[in-house]
Amino acid sequence: MTVADAKKTADQKMQKSIETLKADLAKVRTGRAHTGILDHVMVEYYGNPTNLSQVANVTLIDARTIGVQPFEKKMVAVVEKAIREADLGLNPATQGELIRVPTPPLTEERRKEMVKLVKSEAEDAKIAVRNIRRDANESLKKLVKEKACSEDEERRAQDEIQKLTDKFVIEIDKLVVEKEKEVLTV
């Protein structure tokens, strides 16, 4: 491993932490309906747990209602049950082959809970980024011990990794501010 490898690995891992945070924040419900709410719902399809998007067409009907249309008629009841049991606080209603999923408006108390959840997810992401920084710095120390790089190179690389860490922490903070605004908007 070289100094460049250590920096590249740290950058890739930090980017992955950001992607994970974005995915986690997408699961957090806001006052508006969006199809991302149902992205992680799993449906029993021919004995296998399958992602909802694989067995049904998920669309927005209006600002507060999601429409789910299974590709097969026999899947309507199964999909409705999966949505109901997904612990999202949603109560789907079937109209023929279309399942309407109204998203109830969030109470003020629930909004505050969501903001706490968002902040908790962000803190986890920051911890992950800092752990990646620590691992990268340890890799650099090993390189110095193995005489693969000088102490000056190590210091420069540590500074660059710190700048990288700061950049990703700022990005996490921006994502949190956006999501909080989204959650608190009535």
From Swiss-Prot:
Pfam families: RRF. InterPro entries: Ribosome_recyc_fac, Ribosome_recyc_fac_dom, RRF_sf. One of its GO terms (molecular function) is ribosomal large subunit binding. Coiled coil: none annotated. One of its GO terms (cellular component) is cytosol. GO terms for biological process: cytoplasmic translational termination. It is found in: Cytoplasm. Its main location: cytoplasm. Keywords: Cytoplasm, Protein biosynthesis. The keyword Iron does not apply. HAMAP family: RRF (MF_00040). NCBIfam families: frr. Responsible for the release of ribosomes from messenger RNA at the termination of protein biosynthesis. May increase the efficiency of translation by recycling ribosomes from one round of translation to another. Belongs to the RRF family. This is Ribosome-recycling factor.
